[in-house]
From Swiss-Prot:
InterPro entries: PA_dom_sf, PA_domain, Peptidase_M28, Peptidase_M28B, TFR-like_dimer_dom, TFR-like_dimer_dom_sf. The active site is at 426 (nucleophile), 630 (charge relay system), 668 (charge relay system), 691 (charge relay system). Zn(2+) 2 binds at residues 389, 427, 555. CDD domains: M28_PSMA_like, PA_GCPII_like. This is Glutamate carboxypeptidase 2. Its main location: membrane. Its EC number is 3.4.17.21. The NAALADase activity is found in the central region, the dipeptidyl peptidase IV type activity in the C-terminal. Residues 45-752 are extracellular. Residues 1-22 are cytoplasmic. It comes from Mus musculus (Mouse).
Length: 752
């Protein structure tokens, strides 16, 4: 079990500290008047131990210079030789390899942290597929059972066939209904405007726009008895680019795997809220959290063509329902003309199993503030080879660990403790990170400074993409001004310059875009449940010209090392840039005397979010007046927060940094600010999402929503049966948000 207080290698780590403690004990025994002097010496004078007589900027320069593109390339190659599905021997072997290498790199402590969680696998003897059957029940078409292997991988075993993880077993048959992206608004269009019911039908939807788990939830609410997911060329095939292996587009037989859970931050479905260790109480499977109730299966667009080409019913309501296949995209239900007697049948035989998973946790102890933790984490498990997701991120983490280890071997420790994590079972619902955070939640809430996520390093090669708490805005802006841009046409210019020009903020003129944190990745439990300041960075595509969802080969067998080397980043300059950004964020958070958090950026963001949610509410002016809904209290709280944050920053500028007590007080105020936005009761219906300012959208887990309690209360409010009850809930959520913002402001006031 990971224990941050273990004393391995203590002679090296704490020798200097113990000498001062012995002196301090003697002094205290003589007189208490030397206590303050002792504390000053403890916090300030031993700084040479952390830096080896090298300045902060010099140490950072040395750290960044140590990061090498060729190492990241080598690590990526090594991590993508075989599949690393969670719960398999291959992934366990990779965990042990990373464990051993992190020890070689010089970390003080590296451990494997295991949990027994519910996972889902396809049945090897009864494969999953979809068929079209005639009136006699005979199959006249069936979908592919697997993808064609990419060149060079024909003899690789243990490639899991395409499936939707956690789908229940079942063989439903019936008429097909095309539901576009299966978003909430798509079902509203079908049911309210087109008067088409999905009850008792099998629905087919194209991937994109929203998280697949939300798609399945919407289908269940609409009464569907089964769901088919596919990747449409309009969303996963860029014009003028060839399909893999000749290009980076998705072949017709390529399929996106993925889980279809709706956990809402619960972690392991059998142990929601608590770590899935040997002592855990486990719910029966029938009471598990977040499992879908209808069979679900993914297919490629070649097979989707066969299912959609003879659809009957009305034409698509508008062009946004048409994809890139040569089919009419009729909605159904059922097939037309001579095919009207044919039905669709699903054959789903996947099973769930409690399986052991392994995180790798590495510790680099801080020299001066060992009880303050900065965490860098990314997952290791992959659906198949994981050339981009996750191993492009895992390779970067590996190189960052190596660089910090090199500095440590030279006697240059960080000021604060850095924890490095290789998470398992992220693809199955963020299970590895969530279970570990649940087990150590009290410690993390007390000592966690920040969490930096390190999943896929690239999803394109156009510009930087950052999602983070407003506390980190200034940190990210400042460090990107110090890094060189890898982009063509920006030689000699900073990363900030290219980022600002290619991805300008729609909210703040003259600044690069920074997005809100949603979910779908391992920062979720740290940010949404524990209130630890979080952020992530990667290189992305040009979203203005490249309209496809994510990158085309996402979660397919074709996501290989060769995909990255041939098409995305041949020189690994973008990987190196991402390593520099992630590494510099960790470095600054772990080494800055004053934590590099900016509470005034939070104040600006709160004002923007309050204005936005108010404008949404004013789409219903009559109801706002009738039910006496007012945002005055929220605006007042935001104004108070803004005033207090400004005064806090002024005190911070005047802070005597040689005073360890005052320094610790103000750093703690900064560290705990994110925690102040946490409501222990959570959001309505989503108790593990506890951040009142940010949460994943209820309608798309990938997207972040501000003031989510108010937003959800206002969503589709005109259709609520009990209008008075609905508007009272809006009033209640405004009250909760007001209290939370005001309470957060109180934490920034000068300590009496």
């Amino acid at each position: 079990m990971w224990n941050a207080l273990q004393d391995r290698d203590s002679a090296e780590v704490l020798g200097h500290r113990q000498r001062w403690l012995r002196v301090g004990t003697l002094v205290l025994a003589l007189t208490g008047t030397f206590l303050i002097g002792f504390l000053f010496g403890w916090f300030i004078k031993p700084s040479n131990e952390a830096t080896g007589n090298v300045s902060h900027s010099g140490m950072k320069k040395e750290f960044l210079h140590e990061l090498k593109a060729e190492n990241i390339k080598k690590f990526l190659y090594n991590f993508t030789r075989t599949p690393h599905l969670a719960g398999t021997q291959n992934n366990f072997e990779l965990a042990k390899q990373i464990h051993d290498q992190w020890k070689e790199f010089g970390l003080d402590l590296v451990e494997l942290s295991h949990y027994d969680v519910l996972l889902s696998y396809p049945n090897k003897t009864h494969p999953n597929y979809i068929s079209i059957i005639n009136e006699d029940g005979n199959e006249i078409f069936k979908t592919s059972l697997s993808e064609q292997p990419p060149p060079g991988y024909e003899n690789i075993s243990d490639v899991v066939p395409p499936y939707s993880a956690f789908s229940p077993q079942g063989t439903p048959e019936g008429d097909l209904v095309y539901v576009n992206y299966a978003r909430t608004e798509d079902f509203f269009k079908l049911e309210r405007e087109m008067k088409i019911s999905c009850s008792g039908k099998i629905v087919i939807a194209r991937y994109g726009k929203v998280f697949r788990g939300n798609m399945v939830k919407n289908a269940q609410l609409a009464g569907a008895k089964g769901m088919i997911l596919y990747s449409d060329p309009a969303d996963y095939f860029v014009p003028a680019v060839k399909s893999y292996p000749d290009g980076w587009n998705l072949p017709g037989g390529g399929v996106q795997r993925g889980n279809v859970l709706n956990l809402n931050g619960a972690g392991d479905p059998l142990t929601p809220g608590y770590p899935a260790n040997e002592h855990a109480y486990r719910h029966e499977l029938t009471n598990a959290v977040g499992l879908p109730s209808i069979p679900v299966h993914p297919i490629g667009y070649d097979d989707a063509q066969k299912l959609l080409e003879h659809m009957g019913g009305p034409a698509p309501p508008d062009s946004s329902w048409k994809g890139g296949l040569k089919v009419p995209y009729n909605v159904g239900p059922g097939f037309a003309g001579n095919f009207s007697t044919q039905k669709v049948k699903m054959h789903i035989h996947s099973y769930t199993k409690v399986t052991r998973i392994y995180n790798v946790i590495g510790t680099l102890k801080g020299a001066l503030e060992p009880d303050r933790y900065v965490i860098l984490g990314g997952h290791r498990d992959a659906w198949v080879f994981g050339g981009i997701d996750p191993q492009s991120g895992a390779a970067v983490v590996h190189e960052i660990v190596r660089s910090f280890g090199t500095l440590k071997k030279k006697g240059r420790r960080p000021r604060r403790t850095i924890l490095f994590a290789s998470w398992d079972a992220e693809e199955f619902g963020l299970l590895g990170s969530t279970e570990w955070a649940e087990e150590h939640s009290r410690l993390l809430q007390e000592r966690g400074v920040a969490y930096i996520n390190a999943d896929s390093s690239i999803e394109g090669n156009y510009t930087l993409r950052v999602d983070c708490t407003p506390l980190m805005y200034s940190l990210v802006y400042n460090l990107t001004k110090e890094l060189q841009s890898p982009d063509e046409g920006f030689e000699g210019k900073s990363l900030y310059d290219s980022w600002k020009e290619k991805s300008p903020s729609p909210e703040f003129i003259g600044m690069p875009r920074i997005s809100k944190l949603g979910s779908g990745n391992d920062f979720e439990v740290f940010f949404q449940r524990l209130g630890i300041a979080s952020g992530r960075a990667r290189y992305t595509k040009n979203w203005k010209t490249n309209k496809v969802s994510s990158y085309p080969l996402y979660h397919s067998v074709y996501e290989t090392y060769e995909l990255v080397v041939k098409f995305y980043d041949p020189t690994f300059k973008y990987h190196l840039t991402v390593a520099q950004v992630r590494g510099a964020m960790v470095f600054e958070l772990a080494n800055s005397i004053v934590l590099p958090f900016d509470c005034q950026s939070y104040a600006v963001a709160l004002k923007k979010y309050a204005d936005t949610i108010y404008n949404i509410s004013m789409k219903h002016p009559q109801e706002m007046k009738a039910y006496m809904i007012s945002f005055d209290s929220l605006f007042s709280a935001v104004n108070n927060f803004t005033d207090v944050a400004s005064k806090f920053n002024q005190r911070l500028q005047e802070l005597d940094k040689s005073n360890p007590i005052l320094l610790r007080i103000m750093n703690d105020q900064l560290m705990y600010l994110e925690r102040a936005f946490i409501d222990p009761l959570g959001l309505p219906g989503r108790p593990f999402y506890r951040h009142i300012i940010y949460a994943p959208s209820s309608h798309n887990k990938y997207a972040g929503e501000s003031f989510p309690g108010i937003y959800d209360a206002l969503f589709d409010i005109s259709s609520k049966v009990n209008a008075s009850k609905a508007w009272n809930e809006v009033k209640r959520q405004i009250s909760i948000a007001t209290f939370t913002v005001q309470a957060a402001a109180e934490t920034l006031r000068e300590v009496a």
